[in-house]
Amino acid sequence: MARAAFLFKTVGFGGLQNVPINDELSSHLLRAGNSPWQLTQFLDWISLGRGLATSALVPTAGSRYYQMSCLLSGTLQIPFRPNHRWGDIRFLRLVWSAPTLDGLVVAPPQVLAQPALQAQADRVYDCDDYPFLARDPRFKHRVYQQLSAVTLLNLTGFGPISYVRVDEDMWSGDVNQLLMNYFGHTFAEIAYTLCQASANRPWEHDGTYARMTQIILSLFWLSYVGVIHQQNTYRTFYFQCNRRGDAAEVWILSCSLNHSAQIRPGNRSLFVMPTSPDWNMDVNLILSSTLTGCLCSGSQLPLIDNNSVPAVSRNIHGWTGRAGNQLHGFQVRRMVTEFCDRLRRDGVMTQAQQNQIEALADQTQQFKRDKLEAWAREDDQYNQANPNSTMFRTKPFTNAQWGRGNTGATSAAIAALI
């Protein structure tokens, strides 16, 4: 059904006393323009390059995603305070330029002279509680597209959440022809196009763009775990990965007339998220969650079960609740094995090819782990030396998260969708 509740959740602090962002990071995020709602800003923070290296301040695509979450989590607590006073207090050195939240600017001297806002962790706000958003549905949609993506990252201590749905009824109308227009394009290219379409105009619930996005997500995830491929397609479509296990996988929408999987009737869906920290370097996983955010901005998706999220994320209207859908976690490296096992069983891959892919995946994971852990150590050292200017460049994680995620069960749950 169409979305009626526009709540969003802010970031946790990861053990710090305030939002994990400082003046230097916030200035870097806004260097291209002072409005965090600009489409160029949005497409910038969901993905950078191929996700491997960017800059010292923004080392990965996941860094940009997390840092924008921190910036919005802090600055939006200004207008969402009681009485909606938007310009009388600053977050860091920033204030909103107008009550319509058009942009962020350096606070005037009289505000800079006053103490900054002490933001709170893990807060839930309703867009309709702020009059300027409540009165402008179009701008609220544009804002909520990004706040939905932020919420999908902030609901847990792991990676961003994606929605996967399989329903034959989604293929009605001109969806099949539109899919052919994307033939040969990468998942990232398709995701960018759909994000632009969502920002330009709100999607009708279960309209063409909403159905197209859900089909693209289902094709990606069914391909990601190896359920569909060139010998077992979903209505002739699948995503072909040029080099599975590589540090920068590219998934290309492809077609094959060899064999189509038999799809059971009915509507089946689930939520999935990476639990290992290397999601930070996987643009495809980030874009998948971003597309889910586009869906959330216009449609009410099924609730995520309370037992799948921490206590601070339970019973958020429109997001989590009792008897909701289970949130399935997986370890990125282990999912490569699930992918290879399926293709080998289906006769698409040899054991030697699987061994080669898995060896590459091991090297890739070690490379990513070394980088992410080095950045985390540097951030910890910086925060100890600068207690009044703390920040995290990537979402905090623990060593245990490298081994977490019931990957086999998650892979089986995705496979069971068809």
From Swiss-Prot:
Top-level taxonomic group: Viruses
Compartments in which it is found: Virion
Pfam families documented for this protein: Sigma_1_2
Keyword Protease carried by entry: no
InterPro entries given in the database record: Sigma_1_2_reovir
Keywords recorded for this protein, A-Z: Capsid protein, Inner capsid protein, Virion
A GO CC term assigned to this protein in UniProt: viral inner capsid
Keyword Zinc: no
Annotated function: Inner capsid (core) component.
Similarity annotation: Belongs to the orthoreovirus sigma-1 protein family.
Quaternary organization: Interacts with protein mu-NS; in viral inclusions.
Name used for this protein in its record: Inner capsid protein sigma-2
Organism: Reovirus type 1 (strain Lang)
Gene: S2
